[in-house]
Design a protein with these regions (language model features):
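Short, amphipathic alpha-helical segments that act as regulatory/interfacial helices
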Residues: 6, 100, 104, 314-320, ...
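ATP-dependent adenylate-handling ligase core
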Residues: 258-316, 322, 339-353, 373, ...
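Cysteine-centered catalytic environments shared across enzyme families
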Residues: 1-300, 322, 326
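Mid-to-C-terminal catalytic subdomains of enzymes
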Residues: 325-330, 334-352, 362-473
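Hydrophobic (often cysteine-bearing) scaffold residues that line and stabilize catalytic clefts
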Residues: 13, 92-95, 114, 199-206, ...
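Peripheral terminal appendages
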Residues: 157-160, 200-201, 205, 209, ...
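Short, surface-exposed acidic
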Residues: 31, 90-95, 405, 422-435, ...
């Protein structure tokens, strides 16, 4: 994990760049470098994960070409051996050192060949231009904007570009930029033909592909840790990891000091798999004191993203301050693939599939953004096994009639896939879902709402919300978040498509709060 930045022109002197680039130094506190490309700049803040020596420092160079990459290239060692046989020489153990040889061999078609999560900027000396690309899901962040002289700037986070570019835009996942154009090289969610295997075959494939996705993400030269909420998704990641590694893993859970719903479940999972488990407690005052900091590091005003980030950020902060962990595995992206509580209301399998496509396509603005910022702000790398490209493509291709909840249990396919392994206690494997922001303690969301109520009278709320035409705040809580967002990202609200909400066009989903707690089918999931 690291921070990258690239300038196509020299509108800024080298001495002016740190004022913008160092806003994300937490992403790479180990080493920093700004490289002159001749016509512009490539910048790199490093957090060493693979190839820990100084030889792994970027930008990497090859015959005048240069690259900076924030990413993990899975299965890079066989590729490296193939390239070595072709005569390429390598000086480090870094996975990213193979990028320029791959670019020389395959050109722009290289991006579609990568099994990776990445954001990268390449300087091509032959065309004297920058090429940028982002992984198909957008797990690694990348933004862009234009300078007054027409030059383009790429950066890991939006905050790098505030005050530099008039409009800051998220770089679209699954695209590369070359010759002044954005080109789509990957589409994981458009399915041309569904898989019609029987239930047992589908579940066996889900099992095998998820285990493979976890296994890939356990490869690191730096210490590993695991976020464990006690819910199905993170519990599976932890249990599979413990099985694959064959040793005790370090797990971390957080909850409110009063009513931490998930801590007891996380503890049960940790005990079951024999983990070295740490519990972190947060107070109401900590949540309120940290709110502005969290919104500024997230770069969003979305309600559910901010709520869910409070616990995650404070947990990762404790991990950073109290351990040597450099990599954290998390359970994000399962909901988008297998369904939320609200997708139980999908009127048809086709509607379920379209909703899954929308949610996966927009992940980079919501859950993936949350995981990246909360973890990277604490100088740790996030890895997301449910985002494995092979796994995502397969689950999206499963006949939606099989994925719809006709089983009286959400995410049935995922649960059934691991039923015979006994990797988890049955009461965890078959436990109903609770939203993370609720599961750390119902009182946290209630505290945030109550705090927002104290900030505005009803009249002030109605007056102030009218200032915003795009994604207009609709509660005092959403107005509070928007005002803090505008303080750090003035006029940049279109970076986020809109508020994350259930599909209001579905019966049972016309609600005014993103929390599953307001849905009629929430049941016992949050107890």
């Amino acid at each position: 994990m690291c921070a990258i930045m690239g300038f196509s022109t020299k509108k800024l002197d080298k001495s002016e760049i740190p004022a913008y680039f160092d806003r994300t130094v937490s992403r790479g506190p180990d080493m920093s470098r700004i490289m002159d490309t001749g016509s512009g700049w490539l910048c790199f803040h490093r957090l060493a994960i693979m190839g820990l020596t100084e030889a792994g420092m970027q930008p990497f160079e090859l015959d005048g070409d240069m690259v900076v990459c924030n990413g993990e290239l899975y299965g890079f060692r066989p590729l490296k051996r193939q390239l070595t046989e072709k005569g390429y020489e390598f000086k480090s153990g870094s996975d990213c050192e193979i990028i320029l040889p791959l670019y020389r061999e395959y050109g722009l078609s290289m991006f579609a060949k990568l099994d990776a999560e990445f954001a990268m900027i390449i300087y091509d000396h032959k065309t004297d231009s920058l090429i940028a690309a982002r992984d198909p899901i957008g797990i690694r962040p990348l933004f862009y904007g234009y300078l007054d002289d027409g030059g383009i700037v790429f950066a890991s986070e939006a905050k790098n570009l505030i005050g530099l570019c008039k409009e800051v835009c998220p770089f679209p996942p699954g695209h590369y930029y070359a010759d002044g154009k954005f080109v789509r090289y990957a589409d994981l969610t458009t399915v041309t033909e569904y898989c019609h295997d029987d239930l047992e075959t589908v579940c066996r494939t889900i099992r095998n592909k998820l285990i493979a996705g976890v296994d890939k993400r356990l490869d690191a030269d730096a210490p590993l840790g695991f976020l464990l909420s006690g819910g199905l998704d993170s519990s599976l990641v932890c249990a599979i990891s413990a099985l694959v590694l064959g040793k005790k893993i370090r797990t971390f859970a957080i909850g409110m000091d009063k009513d931490a719903i998930d801590l007891k479940y996380a503890r049960e999972v940790a005990d079951y798999i024999g983990a070295d488990h740490t519990e972190v407690y947060m107070t109401r005052q900590q949540v309120l004191d940290t709110l502005e900091e969290v919104i500024s590091l997230l770069g969003t005003y979305d309600i559910t993203t901010i709520r869910a980030s409070m616990g995650m950020y404070l947990c990762c902060k404790a991990i950073h301050e109290q351990t040597d962990i450099r990599v954290l595995l998390t359970g994000e992206i399962s909901d988008e693939l297998f369904g939320y509580k609200y997708t139980d209301f999908a009127p048809s399998p086709e509607a379920f599939q379209q909703e899954a496509k929308k949610r996966v396509d927009e992940l980079y603005m919501y859950d993936v953004l949350r995981a990246d910022r909360c973890i990277s702000a604490n100088s740790i790398e996030a890895r997301v096994p449910f985002g494995d490209l092979d796994f995502v493509k397969y689950v999206m291709s499963i006949d939606p009639a099989m994925k719809v909840n006709t089983y009286d249990m959400g995410k049935y396919l995922l649960r059934h896939a691991f039923e015979k392994d006994h990797l988890l206690p049955d009461d965890i494997l078959w436990r109903q879902k609770a939203a993370f922001s609720d599961a750390v303690g119902h009182s946290m969301v209630d505290d945030l709402k109550a705090y927002a109520e104290t900030k505005y009278t009803d009249a002030e709320f109605e007056e102030k919300r009218k200032k915003y035409d795009f994604a207009q705040p609709f509660t005092k809580e959403s107005l509070l978040y928007r005002e803090i967002f505008e303080k750090y990202y003035p006029g940049q609200a279109p970076m986020v498509k809109n508020f994350w909400m259930p599909n209001k066009s579905w019966k049972g989903c016309d609600v005014n709060d993103p929390s599953a707690r307001v849905l009629s089918n929430y049941g016992e999931s949050g107890t």
